[in-house]
Amino acid sequence: MANSLRLYLACIKNTLEAAMCLQNFPCQEVERHNKPEVELKTSPELLLNPVLICRNEAEKCLIETSINSLRISLKVKQADELENILTKKFLRFLSMRAEAFQVLRRKPVQGYDISFLITNYHCEEMQKQKLIDFIIQFMEDIEKEIRDLKESVNTRGRLVATEFLKQFM
């Protein structure tokens, strides 16, 4: 793993540890309901300042926190057209299975590739450290999977080109 990626993930992990102090807070508009304030944005006093962590221009993480919820939005690096296509397809595949992840949002925040929504219920049901580790591991795995897919496509392309050019020899 590259040193810049390690530092980027460590920064995100430390920020998540500090931001994941969520508590139960009932909705002020609808009685006996608990809505994530980071999504509704009805009361500005319940929202904290968002934190933007950038590895470079193409890769960044936005962490938005409120009293009862936390939203993490990720922009995955897409260096070329092939990575762009692979990333879009892979993340669309994951978004279609959002129920299996529990904290994954079906639609990402505009300008980002994928988003997670963690509420105080998730922190009560699951361990906070396990949630943080899941998100960090998810980020590592996405980068690794896209790199492997790109390598596989390039290898397959070379093999096809070699077989095609053998016809002319």
Swiss-Prot record:
GO terms for biological process: actin filament polymerization; Arp2/3 complex-mediated actin nucleation. Expressed at low levels in all tissues with a relatively highest expression in inflorescences. SUPFAM superfamilies: Arp2/3 complex subunits. It is found in: Cytoplasm, Cytoskeleton; Cell projection. Its main location: cytoplasm. The keyword Cytoplasm applies. Keywords: Actin-binding, Cell projection, Cytoplasm, Cytoskeleton. Pfam families: ARPC4 (PF05856). The keyword Magnesium does not apply. Component of the Arp2/3 complex composed of ARP2, ARP3, ARPC1/p41-ARC, ARPC2/p34-ARC, ARPC3/p21-ARC, ARPC4/p20-ARC and ARPC5/p16-ARC. Interacts with ARPC2A and ARP3. This is Actin-related protein 2/3 complex subunit 4. The gene is ARPC4.
